[in-house]
């Protein structure tokens, strides 16, 4: 396979979606770096899980390891200071009057991608890869394809340099995301994602289910569970 010679920077939280996107990028680009954000998230355990995932990817997929470069962590704790959501404070997850769940952190992906583009510019990377999706998602406006296309234009103009935002999961269901992971890395990648990635909004890792660790009842766990069941049912 002829790989793209550009460097890609993957927004890598340590979850199922970003791990699948990282595998996707490693099959396509000559050099790949990773980036995470510490923004005061309630499920901060994902920052520990992502290090395990990176280590496992390097160990289990030596061909990918050759292209997997530096990992970066940026402190965006200011986001928790200016937001009041169920992802940054201890509160019940519920639907708000505007139709969005209170897990929506306003401006999060806009800030993430702006910071990622700044880092990418310094690292001579021209591709940003994110796990945003508007199919099986909670209606977050900063996950929509139109939002990200507009942001790609703004970043490219603002940096006076081409910046491409790749979203390989944008139009996939969660079941199709499991299928993509299997296509990319077979059973080993599926098992790695199941065992080591983190999705649960509450940061729960004490309970192990067929689809992975989590509380089993928050929206993120329910979506992952349903997607896994649909994937198994369609095989």
UniProtKB/Swiss-Prot annotation:
Which cofactors are reported in the record for this sequence? Zn(2+)
Q: How is the cofactor bound?
A: Binds 1 zinc ion per subunit.
Catalysis: reaction(s): 7-carboxy-7-deazaguanine + NH4(+) + ATP = 7-cyano-7-deazaguanine + ADP + phosphate + H2O + H(+)
Enumerate the residues binding Zn(2+): 200, 215, 218, 221
Against PANTHER family, the record matches this protein to:
7-CYANO-7-DEAZAGUANINE SYNTHASE (PTHR42914:SF1)
Instruction: Sum up the protein's function in the record's words.
Output: Catalyzes the ATP-dependent conversion of 7-carboxy-7-deazaguanine (CDG) to 7-cyano-7-deazaguanine (preQ(0)).
Q: Does the keyword Transferase apply?
A: no
Any Pfam family matching the protein: QueC
The protein in question is named: 7-cyano-7-deazaguanine synthase
GO MF entry, a single one:
zinc ion binding
Asked if Cytoplasm is a keyword of the record, the answer is: no
Family matches, as CDD domains: QueC-like (cd01995)
InterPro entries, alphabetized: QueC (IPR018317), Rossmann-like_a/b/a_fold (IPR014729)
Kindly state a single biological-process term from the GO annotations of this entry.
Answer: queuosine biosynthetic process
Q: Which domain of life is it from?
A: Bacteria
Q: Which family does it belong to?
A: Belongs to the QueC family.
Q: Where does ATP bind?
A: 12-22
EC number(s) on file: 6.3.4.20
The UniProt keyword set, sorted, is: ATP-binding, Ligase, Metal-binding, Nucleotide-binding, Queuosine biosynthesis, Zinc
């Amino acid at each position: 396979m002829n790989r793209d010679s550009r460097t890609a920077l993957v927004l890598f939280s340590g979850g199922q979606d970003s791990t699948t996107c990282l595998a996707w990028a490693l099959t396509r680009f000559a050099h790949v770096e990773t980036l995470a954000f510490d923004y005061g998230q309630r499920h901060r355990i994902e920052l520990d899980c992502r290090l395990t995932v990176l280590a496992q990817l390097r160990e289990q997929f030596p061909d990918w390891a050759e292209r997997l470069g530096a990992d970066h962590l940026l402190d965006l704790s200011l986001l928790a200071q200016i937001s009041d959501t169920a992802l940054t404070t201890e509160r019940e997850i519920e639907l708000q009057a505007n139709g969005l769940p209170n897990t929506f952190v306003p401006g999060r992906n806009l800030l993430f991608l702006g910071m990622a583009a700044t880092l990418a510019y310094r690292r001579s990377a021209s591709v940003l890869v994110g796990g945003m999706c508007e199919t099986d998602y909670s209606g977050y406006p900063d996950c929509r394809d139109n939002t990200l296309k507009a942001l790609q234009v703004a970043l490219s103009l603002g940096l006076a340099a081409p910046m491409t935002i790749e979203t390989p999961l944008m139009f996939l269901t969660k079941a199709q995301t499991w299928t993509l992971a299997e296509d990319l890395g077979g059973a080993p990648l599926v098992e790695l994602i199941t065992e080591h990635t983190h999705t649960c909004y509450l940061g729960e890792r004490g309970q192990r289910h067929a689809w992975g660790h989590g509380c089993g009842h928050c929206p993120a766990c329910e979506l992952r569970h349903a997607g896994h069941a649909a994937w198994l049912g369609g095989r």
